[in-house]
């Protein structure tokens, strides 16, 4: 089970939002590269970056912080990034800079042709982030709920060559209320590509529950507020996940 620390970037700093609200942000660090090194040293095997300003602006905004993170840990562990990725040039620049995966969210739903082109041009590097509430997909930093069913869209994206799906339950994100295991497993069972759980990770109990469903296709989990608030010790959680997997 991949435990993936999240580093959310706003104005060059590491922050956490509550339910995607830019006005409800808590700053957890002024030095994103140092934060990346901290998680790598704690045993992280992948990092999850979000360019929050970019997500809302529709274009990359935290380039200096992202570059610093890649310089610090990019040669040690894979790094994935979402937020503001709307064109092929942006993807190419990020991959050339050392990013392993780009995460396409809103643009995948609103501009499926772009996602198709991205999968063709950068096969193996494209992850789709699907944010949902009650099984329906949301877009635009969660501000708009669509009529699309998560499973239907994910199957279509799988056919186009997406590497994996990050599934976020937006009713739970940043709330420490527990991962929506049932919905995550339901999606994973409908697909042949891996699903990464996100939204609401509260503590070790969630990690243990996720390890039980790893064989269903749940490859990992994004670790956000819980590892910053102290509700989850990241190194201990990764060690426990490895123990449960018999690693």
UniProtKB/Swiss-Prot annotation:
Pathway: Amino-acid biosynthesis; L-histidine biosynthesis; L-histidine from 5-phospho-alpha-D-ribose 1-diphosphate: step 4/9. Its EC number is 5.3.1.16. GO terms for cellular component: cytoplasm. The active site is at 8 (proton acceptor), 131 (proton donor). It is found in: Cytoplasm. Keywords: Amino-acid biosynthesis, Cytoplasm, Histidine biosynthesis, Isomerase. GO terms for molecular function: 1-(5-phosphoribosyl)-5-[(5-phosphoribosylamino)methylideneamino]imidazole-4-carboxamide isomerase activity. InterPro entries: Aldolase_TIM, His_biosynth, HisA_bact_arch, Isoase_HisA-like, Isoase_HisA-like_bact, RibuloseP-bd_barrel. It holds the Pfam family His_biosynth. It catalyses: 1-(5-phospho-beta-D-ribosyl)-5-[(5-phospho-beta-D-ribosylamino)methylideneamino]imidazole-4-carboxamide = 5-[(5-phospho-1-deoxy-D-ribulos-1-ylimino)methylamino]-1-(5-phospho-beta-D-ribosyl)imidazole-4-carboxamide. GO terms for biological process: L-histidine biosynthetic process; L-tryptophan biosynthetic process. Its main location: cytoplasm. It is an enzyme of class 5 (isomerase). Belongs to the HisA/HisF family. PANTHER family: 1-(5-PHOSPHORIBOSYL)-5-[(5-PHOSPHORIBOSYLAMINO)METHYLIDENEAMINO] IMIDAZOLE-4-CARBOXAMIDE ISOMERASE (PTHR43090:SF2). HAMAP family: HisA (MF_01014). This is 1-(5-phosphoribosyl)-5-[(5-phosphoribosylamino)methylideneamino] imidazole-4-carboxamide isomerase.
């Amino acid at each position: 089970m991949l435990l993936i620390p999240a580093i959310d970037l706003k104005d060059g700093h590491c922050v956490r939002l509550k339910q995607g609200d830019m006005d409800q942000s808590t700053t957890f660090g002024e030095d994103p590269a140092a934060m990346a090194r901290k998680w790598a040293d704690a045993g992280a095997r992948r990092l999850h970056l979000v360019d929050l300003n970019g997500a809302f602006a529709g274009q990359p905004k935290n380039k200096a912080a992202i570059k610093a993170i890649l310089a610090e840990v990019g040669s040690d562990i894979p790094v994935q990034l979402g937020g503001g990725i709307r064109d092929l040039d942006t993807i190419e620049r990020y991959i050339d800079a050392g990013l392993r995966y780009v995460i396409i969210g809103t643009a995948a739903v609103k501009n499926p042709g772009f996602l198709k082109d991205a999968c063709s041009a950068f096969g193996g590097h494209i992850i789709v982030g699907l944010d949902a509430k009650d099984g329906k997909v949301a877009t635009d930093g969660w501000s708009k709920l669509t009529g699309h069913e998560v499973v239907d869209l994910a199957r279509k994206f799988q056919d186009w060559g997406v590497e994996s799906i990050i599934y976020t339950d937006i009713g739970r994100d940043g709330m420490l209320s527990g991962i929506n295991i049932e919905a995550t497993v339901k999606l994973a069972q409908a697909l042949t590509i891996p699903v990464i759980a996100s939204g609401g990770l509260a503590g070790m109990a969630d990690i243990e529950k996720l390890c039980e469903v790893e064989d269903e296709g749940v490859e990992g989990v994004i670790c956000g507020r819980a590892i910053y608030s102290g509700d989850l010790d990241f190194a201990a959680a990764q060690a426990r996940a490895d123990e449960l997997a018999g690693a």
